[in-house]
């Protein structure tokens, strides 16, 4: 990775394309979680990569390149959100299950259940604040460490821990309310 970054610092666009290919999915995912729509997320990701290219000389290598890039994506998205005054994000949880041992009808049933669970999680996350959604996205979906979340968001470690704990509690409460409403509507 260091060699690729050194080449990018020398102006090698092919090396930068390697960095883009390696990080575009995660950058887009984070942007999508923050922006709520595909078009804005694509623009944020593109803007972030342009900023990264223009400022690659500032990357000192103290943290992982991905952490540095996600910080740029995060800040670019927040700037755009402030301009557009968007308030919530849509989070898409993808949980993998091993369905190989099930019959076709069982597989379809499990897919339906998974889709339904995912829908409830998305809806519950939509009820949370942007900060709660960001910390959950970074920790659970992007699998960033607590330290990496600190670097991306400029929050203190204790603050990240508290926010993550509270975000989980709020998510659970939102899910309970949604499911309670769903059960009551069936009765």
Predicted feature residues:
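Sigma70-family region 2
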Residues: 9-10, 36, 49-64, 83-85
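Helix-turn-helix DNA-binding module
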Residues: 123-134, 138-159, 173
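Short helix-capping/turn signature of helix-turn-helix
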Residues: 22-25, 33-34, 137-144
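Structural recognition of an alpha-helix C-terminal capping motif at a helix-to-coil junction
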Residues: 29, 43-50, 63-75
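C-terminal edge and immediately downstream basic/flexible tail or linker adjoining helix-turn-helix-like DNA-binding
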Residues: 3, 7, 89, 120, ...
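Internal acidic/polar
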Residues: 87-114, 145
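Short, charged helix-capping/linker segments at alpha-helix termini
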Residues: 9-18, 28-47, 157, 177-182, ...
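Arg/Lys-rich amphipathic alpha helix in sigma70-family domain 2
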Residues: 57-60, 71-91
């Amino acid at each position: 990775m260091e060699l690729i970054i050194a080449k990018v610092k020398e102006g090698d666009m092919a090396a930068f394309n390697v960095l883009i290919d390696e990080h575009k999915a995660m950058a887009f995912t984070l942007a999508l979680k923050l922006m709520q729509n595909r078009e804005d997320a694509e623009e944020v990701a593109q803007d972030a990569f342009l900023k990264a290219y223009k400022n690659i000389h500032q990357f000192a290598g103290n943290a992982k390149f991905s952490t540095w890039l996600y910080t740029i994506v995060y800040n670019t998205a927040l700037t755009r959100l402030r301009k557009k005054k968007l308030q919530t994000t849509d989070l898409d949880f993808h949980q993998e299950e091993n369905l190989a041992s099930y019959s076709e009808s069982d597989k379809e049933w499990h897919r339906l259940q998974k889709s339904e669970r995912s829908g409830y999680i998305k809806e519950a996350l939509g009820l949370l604040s942007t900060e709660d959604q960001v910390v959950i996205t970074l920790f659970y979906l992007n699998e960033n460490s607590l330290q990496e979340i600190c670097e991306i968001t400029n929050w203190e470690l204790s603050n990240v821990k508290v926010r993550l704990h509270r975000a989980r509690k709020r998510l659970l409460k939102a899910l309970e309310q949604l499911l309670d409403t769903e059960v009551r509507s069936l009765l």
